[in-house]
Amino acid sequence: MSDYKDTLNLPETGFPMRGNLANREPEMLKRWYDEDLYGEIRKAKKGKKSFVLHDGPPYANGDIHIGHALNKILKDIIIKSKTLSGFDAPYVPGWDCHGLPIELMVEKKKGKPGQKISAAEFREECRKYAAGQVEGQKESFKRLGVMGEWDKPYRTMDFGTEANIIRSLGKIADQGHLLKGFKPVHWCTDCGSALAEAEVEYQDKVSPSIDVRFVAADEAATLAKFSTPEGHQGEGELSVVIWTTTPWTLPANRAVALHADLEYVLVQVEAHGEQKAQRLILASELAKSVLDRANIEHYHNLGFAKGSDLELLQFNHPFYNFTVPAILGEHVTTDSGTGIVHTAPGHGQEDFVVGKKYDLEIANPVGSNGVYLPDTELFAGQHVFKANDSVLEVLKEKGALLHHHAYEHSYPHCWRHKTPIIFRATPQWFISMDQAGLRAKALEEVKSVEWMPEWGQNRIEGMIEGRPEWCISRQRTWGVPIALFVHKETAELHPDSLELIEKVAKLVEEKGIQAWWDVDAAELMGEEDAANYEKVLDTLDVWFDSGVTHFSVVDSREEYNFPEEERTHSADLYLEGSDQHRGWFQSSLISSVAMKGKAPYRQVLTHGFVVDGNGRKMSKSIGNVVAPKDVTNKLGADILRLWVASTDYTNEVAVSDEILKRSADAYRRIRNTARFFLANLSGFNPATDIVPAEEMVALDRWAVGRAFAAQQEIIKSYDEYNLHEVTQRLMHFCSIEMGSFYLDVIKDRQYTAKKGGHAQRSCQTALYYIVEALVRWMAPIMSFTADEIWNEMPGEREKFVFTGEWYQGLFDLAEGEEFNNEFWTDIQAVRASVNKLLEAARGEKVIGGALQAEVTLYADDALIAKINKLEDELRFVLLTSAATVKPLSEKTESAKATELDGLFVDVVASEAAKCERCWHHVADVGTIEGHEEVCGRCVSNIDGEGEERKFA
């Protein structure tokens, strides 16, 4: 028996079947950086239309988690796809480097500033610590295959960025949005500092729920307001009843608030057993629930009054020797409580607003550490949360406590310490939302932005409509200074603040933020002014640092120095987690509108949080944390990247070992498809072997047309950031259009046709065109694998797939083409029907394999007309040794019905000899002298001109 193996076109490639990504990716990464891939991309795209995705800076503390990986990979995929679409799309990664978490880490090692270490030394230690954290995170991001300006990222602690943050403050002040005020702000007693809205998270907390009596100072004046019948004005002490869950704020109480339009009832509590007679004022709607919880069963109503009638009546503070007024406020409701609100202007935003209206004292008896100040009567030196019990004791002693019980409710907590926070009035700097129309302008600008998903617009609108002034000052050491001078007596800003800010910014540019604390005011403004003005020693909220990066980074770095007419906004796209509507998206919008009068971004795209396979948050205690490093070490970054791109990331994104295993399986299918292409391009030189499109075999033309259609859909999905649609289309193309049909059909031709003949070269031309497109579709997502494929592809090419653009060599089938998509769809349906009967015949041992079969198709006239177009090449499409087509009228009894109407098929085992080269059973095997074991087709392919293929 002769060995015909050497006469076959066997697949051959250096592209391995197994990716072995965990080991091979680091080698590829090294080459990318050794050969300056990012620099090559920048050179290739210079002068192209710009696309700016501005990186929201992660905090420079700790290892990256799976949420960071999701975020950075999404950004990288978008940047790479934009690059392939012909944009100059630089990526400058950033880090948020100031603020409390870094201070706390340094405090652990070095002690608090001003104690064991000077403030200047402390700042230097913070800078070093942050720099180390940036380096660690940077290496982790690079390992994920994320390309960018890693050698020159932006860090909010870079001297130039710090200087620009200070300039931003100057611009906002110059536009009239800066405000100094003594206001209640979210205050963390552990941080010892104010918190921004975005630094507050809500958790359930158990608090004491108390109803407290404030006795009327002038009983007759109070009774006169109620419609009580003469002589029936009741008996016992007369009080209003307030409800609160923060007893510790009662020392700061300066009023009781009612709603002007609510009806209030004067209730007579009857003497009964131990219950003394007393009279209580409550909102009519809530009276029964208040009395029920106080276990008061015997009572009746004496009279009614409108809230507006009770304004300015005086009531005694429950434990201090002064009276407080009844005031009116829109914030009073009957949702819960008593309909009368305890008002402490120093401890609540609504209390503060209504307190200003009535010119109430903004009492603040609480220090920055949450402890009552030394002059706080009854409670000095106690921590507020521990003082709740003391307050209750005093209320009981004074007979002012009507009722109390434990109450679980949602309460603001510090996002860092996870501890309850307080509202505390302190002198702070604010960006005013209303004094110069900032809120209205910001809401207007929201409408000009494309929000993806669309619900993001309503979300941020609601937040901006309801948000308080932005408190931008912090009482911390490691932060950008609020570089302002205020008059020692009037507290007014220096009239030349803008010029002074520029002088300070220049110093900071040279020496960093320490320059502010070192510089003598006289150096900047002369001795005379310096005697009257003092430096502000507060630092800026870190959300201000990151919020103004549209100016401090995007408007300032040379990478973004694009023509002005291209840039309607500082950035085209911001892409972060959905929690950033209340964080970075909002701080960026407010600061940009305050500085420039417009939004900083054209589009805002959000992704959901990462959860486990059961939809639970990642938690070390549950043990469901998936660390990026573990995934890259075990499966490789491309699997992680494919997981990211396969998910509808606008919702919660699930990850688990099982989900990653599914990504690995999908990856293998794509890799095997690419390997088939490469292996079958062995010996193909595109410079000399390309077959002109019009001369290609019909099926090859169809395959290129399918790639053309897939490419259009894939580019559209990339443009719309619908990455899961990209992966779905890619999988469908590889598994269904190619794997289940085209690649299956062409194996015979590819392996057995004459080496270098038209039949093989037509097929290779199609494979070449398709792999040129496929490698580019993959590149943004499976970057390492695309690079590997690129280096195995035939022909002259650029060094990297990432510097090019989408492949332009594909073509669609011509209008009116005979062998069009519809034709091949019908043929695939015929093939699928025949395959089912071949499987059944194999199961019944009628045949061993499909090539042992001869099939007869009995079809209606319309189907025959289509099938017969393939002439004697139908058998190659069906993968059988023979295929005959006959009209339905000639159908035999042995022919079986198929799923297709009008098609019956008869399957018989071929009695012809098997060709030892192509394995087809054909009558002419052994009929040609010198080739006793092979068929005539194979002899032609070995020694002759080669078979002719027109259709398949």
Swiss-Prot record:
Reactions listed under catalytic activity: tRNA(Ile) + L-isoleucine + ATP = L-isoleucyl-tRNA(Ile) + AMP + diphosphate
GO CC list: cytosol
Keyword terms, alphabetized: Aminoacyl-tRNA synthetase, ATP-binding, Cytoplasm, Ligase, Metal-binding, Nucleotide-binding, Protein biosynthesis, Zinc
Residues where L-isoleucyl-5'-AMP binds: E576
Sequence motif 'KMSKS' region, residues: 617-621
SUPFAM superfamilies registered for this protein in UniProt: Anticodon-binding domain of a subclass of class I aminoacyl-tRNA synthetases, Nucleotidylyl transferase, ValRS/IleRS/LeuRS editing domain
CDD domains noted in UniProt: Anticodon_Ia_Ile_BEm, IleRS_core
GO biological process: isoleucyl-tRNA aminoacylation
Subcellular location: Cytoplasm
Motif ('HIGH' region): 58-68
Primary localization: cytoplasm
Record-listed E.C. numbers: 6.1.1.5
Binding-site residues, Zn(2+): C915, C918, C935, C938
Role, per record: Catalyzes the attachment of isoleucine to tRNA(Ile). As IleRS can inadvertently accommodate and process structurally similar amino acids such as valine, to avoid such errors it has two additional distinct tRNA(Ile)-dependent editing activities. One activity is designated as 'pretransfer' editing and involves the hydrolysis of activated Val-AMP. The other activity is designated 'posttransfer' editing and involves deacylation of mischarged Val-tRNA(Ile).
UniProt xrefs under HAMAP family: Ile_tRNA_synth_type1
Official protein name in the record: Isoleucine--tRNA ligase
